[in-house]
Amino acid sequence: MRVKDTLNLGKTKFKMRGNLPVNEQKREDIWAENKIYEQRQKLNEGKPSFVLHDGPPYANGNIHMGHAMNKISKDIIVRYKSMSGFRSPFVPGWDTHGLPIEQQLTKEGYDRKKMSTADFRKLCHEYALKQVDKQRTDFKRLGISAEWDHPYLTLNPEFEAQEIRTFGRMAELGLIYRGKKPVFWSWSSESAMAEAEVEYHDVTSPSAFYAEKVNDGKGVLDENTYFVVWTTTPWTIPASEGITIDAGFDYSVVQPAGEDRKFVIATDRLNYAAEQFGWEDVQTLQVIRGRELDRIKAIHPFDNDRELVVMLGDFVTLDSGTGLVHTAPGFGEDDFRVGKEYGLDIFVPVDDRGYMTAEAGPDFEGVFYEDANAIALDKLKASNALLKQMDYVHSYPFDWRTKKPIIFRATPQWFASVDKIRDQILEAIEDVEFLPDWGQKRLHNMIRDRGDWVISRQRVWGVPLPIFYAEDGTPILEKETINHVADLFEKNGSDIWFQWEAKDLLPEGYSNEHSPNGEFTKENDIMDVWFDSGSSHQGVLAQRDYLEYPADLVLEGSDQYRGWFNSSLITSVAVSGKAPYKKVISQGFTLDGKGHKMSKSLGNTIVPDEINKKMGAEIIRLWVSSIDSSSDVRVSQENFVKASESYKKIRNTVRYLLANTSDFDPKENGVDYNELRPEDRYMLVQFNELISKIRTSYDNYDFIDIYKTLLNYIITDLSAFYLDFAKDVVYIEPENSLKRRSMQTVFYKILVGLTKLITPILPHTAEEIWEYLREPEEFVQLAEMPEVANYTDGADLLSKWQSIKELRSHVLKALEEARDSKMIGKSMEAKATLYLDESTKQLVDTLGVDLRLILIVSQLEVKALSEAPKDAAIFDDQLAVEITPAQGEVCERCRMTKTDVGSDEHFATLCASCAQIVTENYPEAITEGFEEK
């Protein structure tokens, strides 16, 4: 027999390395086979509900790190709620219509203009489902627990039907109308766009200052006077119909030296203009208030047959330009508004693909709009109207899918009126909680300032607008027809809109006074995809009886304030008068390590699959819990290396606890709270505080606080304190001694509680740990979160032990100094003499603390503070410490230096305490003796 055979050296099959990339997938298979998600839902039947509604990601390509961050965040919340007394189902969704899928098929060689709409839509449908399967696999690999077999897809007939009914309700309320006004127009997509589909980039455009000659000065200006206007879109000059000024600004009529012409410029911009044009000795002839110039006429700079009218508008500024704005009502929202006020025609000489039409004039016809800039500038020069041309850097809208610039273009479109229900929507926002709280103001301002929603799209892969036209062109948006279409879609899918005649899509026997011959046609446009996802509160929440409407929570990227948060809010308030969610959490974007947007072309992407294969999904999940995702998040390999190191600390700590409870059965060996040793009772109370803090952080969605609290507890309270001296009990003391079982009781309670607490973040690891615990639930996901206990002496214990730990830190410092001076090697070679004041000594005595144990020294002596020698290390007014080498020899078993080593005749290398333990528990050692080293 060897001495080590008499020690209770912990053993466990729980490996130091998790081999996560391999073992996680095996565990996910086990979850699927055992239907863990379904079991959890069944357990929670009848409990209060908590519904997190999944904003649908777009079904195109593998998931990126932003997807991972978002879905893992949701999973953490849902798992926690499910283990905390809530019925919390999670239905994942996908946005499956839209331009990117059409574009992808075009890349694969399909030309939608050379095939039937029905055939092209079939290809889109098949492609979308493949993408859903691909992303579902990616999400499941991250350990996301969800209703994977019954997700919601915006292409599902039942969803499309509810979307049509949502549209119908809005039409019934008079919120749907057809109008011609400028909308974001993507020539690269050949379709109108919503604000949520637009992104902005800085671009350099040719800007021009040019003069427009007064034609009818109304007795205010003579005909040798020119308005100086400014534009950053010279290509729109062919569509110019007026000049907009501000009624309250002062405008100066000036004449520079050497010029026959007189010019009108906003007085506050005169110095700037003179500098730009190189004017000298500028003479001010007249100062006129803007309102006096109203309806004065000017001549178009390169079309003498066209008159321009001076108009008063509220959008003119003095920040740039001249205070006079070139106005083309067909190409700008403000221009359109002021043009309508003045009764101007809406002139739009650009086609769907961005090419100028014949209306623009022979020099422009067939020219791409960007190329028309140069022609317009040349014509200004030729007519001596151009005063200055310069490059201008400004923010410009782009199609977020094609990454091409877009234009404002007035076209006939279908709109959802926001204006009619704006006040209701703003009121609904007041009832919603936001995290971060600035989200409320952001969404409020967006709704306050946004225009009506253009919901029609000139594409084919989407939900058709359920609108019919009578023989005289009257649009038909009746409750009867729309609901009938919804019923047809629910039964047959929306493809029938493109396969059936209009008469077959109308209710049997339907008639309309505008179609005396019974002839009808149908709308060709489809709905904006934001109307698809924006109807999910009706298509999912209100449809599935185990969900709730409104949802308790939505959690998406901050771009969704203008996207899904926005569109779903509008439709929900329209159909039900309330917001579709009670709380909104927004997250920032994932950027590369340098703060740049991730892009395949830049080669700076890190994708979840790469980390999964290299380190495991648990590392991504732990990383998600370690970041503040309320703002933009930088992602680098170093982030995951750091998360991996933290994971190892958690795993190794758990492994130590498992190894040292392998012979512990809580039912047979557990020690009651009142019988626990002082240090163990304190650790249990402290762990109870940890449970309280972490659960509060979960409730507040404060993942980073959970991460920090957990790591600090493991490193500081367990590893550096409790487990630091634990081996002197669990290894050394008799197997069934109260001292050892007391500590094991706390070890086990910490293990069980800790495993439950980390389950939402590290479910794979938690399940692996759970297999080694003697708990009734087969899977930890089917257990409940640890409850916060009420220890009557808890607060008192925490306060007193804080003093003990401060004392310990002072002694450890003195031991460190003794090591540095070579007085001792390990702390077990030391004797510590503590000189305590009366209150501290009384505290130690009251608690019954084994100070020698927690200080990890071989010998300890406690004396009055008044006896402290001058060379003792003094800490405040309560403690002095003297470290000296311990007297005696080192016990081969407990490694303590003692004066009674060899006092037992049978065990020459053991101290008296170890000799007694061996004699009582290993009597064979007396006759056999120990093997020599």
Curated annotation (Swiss-Prot):
Cellular compartments annotated: Cytoplasm
GO cellular component term of the entry, any: cytosol
Species for this entry: Pediococcus pentosaceus (strain ATCC 25745 / CCUG 21536 / LMG 10740 / 183-1w)
Positions bound to ATP: 600
CDD domains: Anticodon_Ia_Ile_BEm (cd07960), IleRS_core (cd00818)
Residues where L-isoleucyl-5'-AMP binds: 556
Protein name: Isoleucine--tRNA ligase
Sites where the protein binds Zn(2+): 891, 894, 911, 914
Entry keyword annotation includes Electron transport: no
Subunit-structure text: Monomer.
GO biological process, one term: isoleucyl-tRNA aminoacylation
Main localization category: cytoplasm
Swiss-Prot/TrEMBL cofactor(s): Zn(2+)
